[in-house]
């Protein structure tokens, strides 16, 4: 192992890798690729997560990237909706599919889904979507018309899309452009000519692990497991995938904790100086979703409930020095910052400058209002 590192170094390095310090100049797909996907069940938050990392951006640029096939939208990590790049997205989907969560007895008991039903559902969905863009109701109607699948109508109508997620992970469907307020589905090759397909898991693992550690390292296997699937993939399987990287991953000591990083990043991390940069990040931002809100170096344990709310809601956050020091909300023309009182005096000048940057991104006048929480 190399010399010990500090958590302020690690957090500053992550800020740099995640295009937050300094702000980057990459394309929209390159931001998504660097972050290993962007959580997207709240479309405005997803676009803002990308725009705050780009020195120059435009409203609607995510929608344009989707329309042009430079991004796809589908259920991915932790079963949640994400923006992915079509060239690489199939790699993470492959690992999720490898978990075979839908084959668990609990799925059969709850949904009445046997292996025979799954074997019939996949081709039914692919056939229904071949050359077509269908709303959920149109897709369900096509599926339940098939022999032996009529009982799935209610489950397929679930707002969470539980039965459709395994199909997304196997590359059978992804989201298409909305039709009014209704979602649509299509085949990934139709969504993007850049679609790279769902790789074999062993090949996919090397791609995804390298990408994850390039943005969220140093980290552990458990960090990766939680980010990918909330623990639904076995540690044994993950260890096999990790071992395939050989000496590409190396162990480092961060204030007494043993974690891993890509070998090519070790010297850069060791040379990184702590940062004092202040950033406002939107809800569900990858800065906290990547390591998880239970990473006490990013979100102090006593403040986890301020960030991670009921029903899976993740608050907009104020990051200073690489850790979460507050939350914020937009109230009319006011950006109301709730600065954690234990973090010391609020950096008012830095907060004002960051709100001015937000005002430029959103093309509106904003002012900062700082309070203690």
Over which residues does each language-model region extend?
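Long, low-complexity intrinsically disordered regions
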Residues: 1-288, 293-373
């Amino acid at each position: 192992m190399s010399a010990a590192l500090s958590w302020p170094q690690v957090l500053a390095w992550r800020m740099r890798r995640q295009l937050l310090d300094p702000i980057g100049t990459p394309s929209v797909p390159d931001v998504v690729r660097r972050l290993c996907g962007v959580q997207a069940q709240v479309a405005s938050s997803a676009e803002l997560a990308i725009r705050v990392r780009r020195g120059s951006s435009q409203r609607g640029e995510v929608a344009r990237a989707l329309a042009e096939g430079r991004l796809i939208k589908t259920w991915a990590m932790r079963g949640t909706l994400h923006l992915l790049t079509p060239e690489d997205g199939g790699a993470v989907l492959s690992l999720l599919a490898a978990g075979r969560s839908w084959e668990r007895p609990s799925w059969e008991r709850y949904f009445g889904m046997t292996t025979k039903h799954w074997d019939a559902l996949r081709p039914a969905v692919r056939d229904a979507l071949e050359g077509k863009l269908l709303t959920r109701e149109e897709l369900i109607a096509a599926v339940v018309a098939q022999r032996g699948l009529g009982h799935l109508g209610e489950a397929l109508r679930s707002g969470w899309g539980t039965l459709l997620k395994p199909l997304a992970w196997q590359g059978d469907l992804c989201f298409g452009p909305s039709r009014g307020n209704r979602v649509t589905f299509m085949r990934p090759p139709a969504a993007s000519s850049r679609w790279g397909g769902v790789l074999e898991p062993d090949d996919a693992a090397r791609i995804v692990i390298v990408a994850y550690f390039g943005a969220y390292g140093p980290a552990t296997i458990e960090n990766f497991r939680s980010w990918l699937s909330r623990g639904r993939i076995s540690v044994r399987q993950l260890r096999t995938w990790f071992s395939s990287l050989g000496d590409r991953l190396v162990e480092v000591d961060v204030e007494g904790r043993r974690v891993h990083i890509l070998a090519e990043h070790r010297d850069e991390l060791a040379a990184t100086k702590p940062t004092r940069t202040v950033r406002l990040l939107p809800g569900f931002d990858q800065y906290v979703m990547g390591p998880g809100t239970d990473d006490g170096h990013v979100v102090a344990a006593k403040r986890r409930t301020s960030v991670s709310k009921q029903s899976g809601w993740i608050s907009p956050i104020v990051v200073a020095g690489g850790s979460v020091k507050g939350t914020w909300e937009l109230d009319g023309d006011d950006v109301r910052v709730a600065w954690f009182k234990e973090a010391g005096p609020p950096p008012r000048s830095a907060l004002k400058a960051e709100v001015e940057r937000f005002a430029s991104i959103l093309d509106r006048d904003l002012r900062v209002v700082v309070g203690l929480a």
